[in-house]
């Protein structure tokens, strides 16, 4: 008797359950692009780990409701426009890790950009001002040029007899060039 009631109940509920299941709309996956001007982002990269953790706290599941596309120029900055074009076809947001990448995304894509740079975003022209950045870009910058000069001053104080210091930088990266010029000016000061 119990088996018969269970079968009848199951058959009676089947149309209701299937209608409910089939009427659910699929959740659209969100696409985030990561653009590196240097080495590729790996799953162990701080930015990838942080993104996954942050999005998962908001209910996104990487691989289904959140897709992260990664591109890297591997120091070939002339490849950045091509990589941006590739990312912007799918991504709703692009996150960059350098001034060079942020500049190219800003100039070539009309989607939101989060720039994590070691350069002053106002001095490099990425944004108009900190209060009103304008455009499609936001992010984190730093006063690295001033810090470079201060670091050199501390170094000179620690080693007063030192006469030569070498500094490596990428002349194609305005942020790095600004840091170099600031350090160079500090080196000349007595």
Model-inferred region functions:
Residues 1-190:
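Short hydrophobic alpha-helices and adjacent helix-cap/hinge residues
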